[in-house]
Amino acid sequence: MASTAPFAKMNGIGNEIIVADMRGRADQVTAAAALALNGDAATRFDQIMAIHDARTPGTAYYVDILNSDGTSAQACGNGMRCVVQALAAETGQKTFTFETRAGILNAREHADGTISVDMGMPHFGWQEIPLAEEFRDTRMIELQIGPIDAPVLHSPSAVSMGNPHAIFWVDRDVWSYELERFGPLLENHPIFPERANITIAQVTSPESMIIRTWERGAGLTKACGSAACASVVAAARTRRTGRSVNLLTPGGGTLHVEWLDNDHVILTGAAEWEFSGSFDPSTGTWARDTESAA
């Protein structure tokens, strides 16, 4: 195997993550490597979090994010928690400042092992999300799936958490909707020039909701941190919930999201290590570390 890089297979509340240690290297994880890793059942993932040396003063590392289809992602809250857990275990440090495509993110590991990530501030302008046409109020945009007189899903809220999100509000069980069928259509709808993450959200109380997400570039996932943040912000904007909410995800885990008065959104949850190995960032060829072999 050519010059290899260490990696850890992890998950954040079921969101399948590969944390790749690219520090001290000039190369990048290629789309071909991402596709190869995702094609192997053992390393199948939703996002790769590639840790690079810092590019900006005041930050510890630059984190490049790739989806399972090889495309780039701006944000992944669950993946950032995995990065923090891996680095905290290595260094003993508890607080970190990262640079990502979405900007600067601060994160902290708590004494109980949970990790909080400051996901930054949401954006609501139609050009910021972005949308392909003007909407003066993105708390509800004109978009639906199904017949005009009996739509299956309609009138989502739109918000950016550094990446575009559309949240469809439903009263029935979120599992009763064919998100695997509608997700690709909505992700690639012309209204979203950069595609979008699609979430079905059911509010169960002013402090709780259940969500399912079709992730842009990854498909159906067991959890999506930025979608959880977008859902809470959108719910608070439309007076469905307060600004501090627990979310149950398809992976069975719970995320906590708080939209602070300073407009920053804090995502808190757990992260779990599965195994470690090494891989070729160019081809995706990989080997499991002996000590973590099953």
UniProtKB/Swiss-Prot annotation:
Substrate binds at residues 15, 47, 67, 77-78, 163, 197, 215-216, 225-226. Pathway: Amino-acid biosynthesis; L-lysine biosynthesis via DAP pathway; DL-2,6-diaminopimelate from LL-2,6-diaminopimelate: step 1/1. Its EC number is 5.1.1.7. The record marks 165, 215 as: Could be important to modulate the pK values of the two catalytic cysteine residues. GO terms for biological process: lysine biosynthetic process via diaminopimelate. Pfam families: DAP_epimerase. The keyword Isomerase applies. The active site is at residues 76, 224. One of its GO terms (molecular function) is diaminopimelate epimerase activity. SUPFAM superfamilies: Diaminopimelate epimerase-like. It catalyses: (2S,6S)-2,6-diaminopimelate = meso-2,6-diaminopimelate. Keywords: Amino-acid biosynthesis, Cytoplasm, Isomerase, Lysine biosynthesis. It is found in: Cytoplasm. It is an enzyme of class 5 (isomerase). One of its GO terms (cellular component) is cytosol. NCBIfam families: DapF. Belongs to the diaminopimelate epimerase family. Catalyzes the stereoinversion of LL-2,6-diaminopimelate (L,L-DAP) to meso-diaminopimelate (meso-DAP), a precursor of L-lysine and an essential component of the bacterial peptidoglycan. Homodimer. This is Diaminopimelate epimerase. The gene is dapF.
